[in-house]
């Protein structure tokens, strides 16, 4: 019972693991660690995706970054930053070989004469920039990045900083971008608080896993740790990267620039608060196979590309569909990944500002002592259950309720921002992607769900983004407010990032002040 692709596969000969975000089995939310170590089960191979001739250097380096994300499993905020830095380094190196584009850090100071603006020089420059960047961010994976360089017939040990050579330009721009990003508020170096990417804001939850003090606020959950398929040990969640609102954005002035108004509150807007909880129970009780497969497809948990990487795979599809040049992909991935960076900052600003309750806590509180109609668990369908027993449709096997506050939805924010960029770059909302599941191929209810072949279709980028956000309501980890305000925030972020990216492409320095 294999999954199969439709439209999205016909444009690519890459292995399935490197195309369009296969959702993967997620066994734990793995709370507490901002950057997780390794996948919970051993992999047969850690090889990078096979490099095919039709994949330009931008796609090859994007795949290298995505493979690192799949294996190292950084949280979505960290993964988005990782992708943005990688593609910013490539863009800044490429800008030296364009007649008008300016780099983010060095402007037009490294611009080379027209006779040097060859395809090969661009490949060399962006590859050294990507290599230095990736090696800095994930030095433990340098052997994999060496393999990509070798495949491009480049010597990764060449440390030249000669600005008259593409190698030197690549290394120089990587130095400049990394120096800036080492001090961007993410705490990559652990110099603001001990431990890379650790919290330095002294965040402490109001509620504990076993005591609910404020029903409007986030409650960390006690979650099982996978142990050979048996669940006998537990961890208590910690807010993942609560400091992220302090990270320097690309296009926004600050992380709070597009902060939405507060979500529904039990103490201030009880009717709307209760209604949204009831809506989730109704969705849970009436889940269709199509909706269940939407949940699984968009899960994007710790052993996949995460939501930011998922949209990079959509961009790879666009590159193939529209027959992109190297120049096209440098610019598209630069704008896309920086929108994902800013989307993460904006979403986590709202999460930190409102510290809002997750549905599982709210539903257990609101309907305590009552029987509710809802999804009853794996293979059980809809049942009447105690409200305190209600769980999202992805508990344990898929990504359990994530380790950070609810409002706003990261999926919704990331996806809406990415869709805005792809719409702007292609000058059209047309997407044309789809993904099919064979009967019984569910990772969660294998053999039962879906009962017949299901195909998810996205005629537009907007439709894909909306489905990503809605999927989090179907599974029960986000309220309507968290989804819709996340979409709105993401669209604002995407438009702002595109405005700045386009100014950089066109060398309009006067428009770059934010």
What are the roles of these predicted feature ranges?
Residues 1-14:
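N-terminal secretory signal peptides that target proteins for export/translocation
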Residues 30-36:
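Signal peptide processing junction and immediate N-terminal pro/mature segment
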Residues 15-18, 415:
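Alpha-helical and His/Cys-centered functional microenvironments
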Residues 36-514:
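Acidic/polar surface patches and capping/hinge elements
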Residues 18-29:
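Bacterial N-terminal signal peptides
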């Amino acid at each position: 019972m294999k999954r199969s692709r439709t439209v999205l596969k016909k444009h690519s000969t890459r292995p399935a693991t490197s195309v369009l975000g296969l959702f993967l089995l997620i066994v734990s939310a793995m709370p507490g660690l901002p950057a997780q170590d390794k996948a919970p089960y051993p992999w047969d191979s850690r090889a990078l995706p096979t490099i095919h001739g039709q994949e330009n250097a931008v796609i090859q380096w994007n795949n290298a970054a995505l493979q690192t994300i799949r294996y190292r499993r950084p949280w979505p905020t960290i993964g988005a930053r990782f992708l943005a830095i990688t593609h910013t380094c490539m863009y800044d190196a490429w800008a030296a070989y364009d007649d008008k584009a300016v780099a983010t850090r060095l402007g037009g100071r490294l611009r080379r004469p027209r006779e040097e603006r060859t395809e090969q020089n661009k490949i060399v420059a962006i590859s050294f920039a990507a290599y230095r960047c990736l090696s800095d961010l994930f030095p433990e994976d340098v052997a994999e990045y060496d393999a990509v360089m070798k495949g491009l017939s480049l010597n990764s040990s060449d440390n030249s900083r000669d600005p008259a050579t593409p190698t030197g330009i690549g290394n120089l721009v990587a130095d400049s971008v990394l120096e800036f990003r080492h001090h961007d508020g993410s705490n990559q170096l652990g110099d603001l608080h001990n431990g890379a990417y650790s919290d330095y804001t002294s965040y402490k939850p109001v509620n504990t896993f076993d005591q609910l003090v404020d029903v409007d606020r986030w409650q960390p959950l006690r979650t099982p740790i996978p142990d050979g398929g048996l669940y006998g040990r537990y961890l208590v969640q910690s807010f993942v990267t609560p400091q992220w609102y302090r990270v320097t954005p690309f296009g926004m002035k600050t992380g709070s620039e597009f902060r939405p108004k507060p979500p529904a509150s039990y103490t201030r807007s009880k009717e709307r608060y209760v209604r949204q909880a009831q809506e989730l129970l109704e969705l849970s009780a009436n889940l269709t196979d199509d909706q269940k497969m939407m949940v699984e497809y968009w899960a994007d948990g710790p052993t996949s590309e995460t939501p930011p990487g998922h949209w990079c795979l959509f961009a790879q599809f666009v590159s193939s569909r529209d027959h992109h040049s190297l120049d096209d992909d440098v610019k598209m991935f630069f704008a896309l990944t920086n929108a994902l960076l800013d989307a993460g900052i904006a979403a986590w600003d709202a999460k930190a500002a409102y510290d809002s309750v997750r549905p599982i806590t709210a539903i257990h509180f609101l309907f305590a002592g009552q029987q509710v109609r809802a999804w009853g668990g794996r293979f059980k369908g809809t049942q009447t259950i105690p409200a305190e027993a209600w769980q999202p449709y992805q508990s344990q096997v898929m990504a359990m309720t994530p380790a950070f506050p609810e409002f706003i939805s990261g999926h919704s924010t990331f996806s809406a921002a990415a869709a805005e960029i792809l719409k702007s770059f292609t000058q059209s909302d047309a997407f044309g992607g789809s993904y099919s599941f064979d009967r019984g191929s569910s990772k969660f209810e294998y053999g039962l769900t879906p009962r017949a072949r299901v195909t998810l279709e996205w005629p537009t980028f907007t439709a894909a983004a909306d489905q990503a956000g809605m999927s989090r309501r179907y599974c029960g980890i986000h309220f309507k407010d968290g989804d819709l305000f996340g979409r709105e925030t993401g669209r604002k972020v995407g438009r702002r990032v595109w405005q700045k990216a386009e100014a950089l492409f066109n060398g309009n320095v006067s428009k770059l002040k934010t």
